[in-house]
Amino acid sequence: MQSLTIPKQILEDLVAEARRAAPQECCGLLAGQKMHVTRHYKITNIVATEGAEIANFDVAKISHLQRLTPVERAEIAFVMDAREMSMAFKDMRANALDLQVIYHSHPQSPSRPSLTDIRNATDFESVRKVLNLAEPVHMIISLENQAAPVLNAFRIAEGKVSQVPYNLT
């Protein structure tokens, strides 16, 4: 499996962003070409806003999320702001970049995809294919141990998860 290459500064920025957002989840996109990341797009996690769309979660999670305040929701889930995502994709097209990574943080849990993460990634597959987007890597930043954040990258296809190695430049 081909490894992902990420500039050290972008990785440091992801950790800093996750720490600033904690206890809420942060999220965003990384772009580049051929598994080489060159650009970072921080996207607002709107799940904490009143009236945020939570219908894309499974029924059990929706039931749980509905009992929480918007701020509490953002501690265990994320929904990217559609307008900001659209602007990021427009910038990618203008600069001949492809989506390489979809990232988010787990402020209090390990750096591995949750069942909701797997379901959302699997749902995104059909959209990605229609839009002719590159297959993204999913990166999770864990702050479970604040002193030593853990970042792991994964391919999620057809509900199956495989770890993707990454290198820093």
What is the meaning of each model-derived region?
Residues 104-108:
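Histidine-centered divalent metal-coordination motifs
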Residues 1-100, 110-169:
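Conserved beta-strand-loop surface patch within small alpha/beta domains used
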